[in-house]
Structures are given as C-alpha cells and as structure tokens.
Amino acid sequence: MGEVKFYLVEGRMLIRHDRMPEWWKFRKYVRALKPEHAVEKVLSELGSNHKVKRYHVKIERVVEVPPEEVPDRTLLVLASLTRWVKP
C-alpha cells in the first residue's frame, strides 16, 4: 500500500442551478493515496454537504501539499494516529 498524502483541491461548483445560477469557488484539503482519490473524496463531500451533482462541479487544480501547509487541524490529528481503539 502507498503512503497517504495531503492534497489541495480547488475548483468551482454551481449553486442554485435552476434559478439564478451562481458559480462558487472552493478550496478543500483532503488526505488520499493518489490525486484521483482526492478528487473523488471532494466530489463525494460536496454532493453530501451541498447536494451538488458531480456534473455541476469543475475541478481546476489538484496539488500535493506538505503537512506544514495544511490549515485544518483535524486532518493533521488524524494523520498522526497510529491505530483506532474501539470501546
């Protein structure tokens, strides 16, 4: 298995496509094995949180970033875990 890396995914999503459509920019930091997996994770999260269809999301850039540049503390804490403990 490969090493899990941090990726920055930037793009635009179409909000209110039926009345007064508007494109919103987004920047999302995710952990993934490959850039393709990072894009898949972002599409899944945007669809879940904002009810946006995949064809209403345009990915503009996927960049691997070092852990020092990730502003999301939750991702850094998850990356430092070595195992899960079930109660």
UniProtKB/Swiss-Prot annotation:
One MF term in the entry's GO annotations: large ribosomal subunit rRNA binding
Keyword match Methyltransferase: no
The keyword Metal-binding is annotated on this UniProt entry: no
Gene3D superfamilies hit by this protein: 3.10.20.10
Keywords tagged on the record: Ribonucleoprotein, Ribosomal protein, RNA-binding, rRNA-binding
Gene Ontology process terms (BP): translation
GO CC annotation: ribonucleoprotein complex; ribosome
InterPro entries: Ribosomal_eL20, Ribosomal_eL20_dom
Cystine pairings recorded for this chain: none
Residues in coiled coil: none
Stated family: Belongs to the eukaryotic ribosomal protein eL20 family.
Record's subunit section: Part of the 50S ribosomal subunit. Binds 23S rRNA.
NCBIfam families in UniProt: PRK00773.1-1 (NF001981)
HAMAP family per the UniProt record, alphabetical: Ribosomal_eL20 (MF_00273)
Protein name listed in UniProt: Large ribosomal subunit protein eL20
Primary gene name: rpl18a
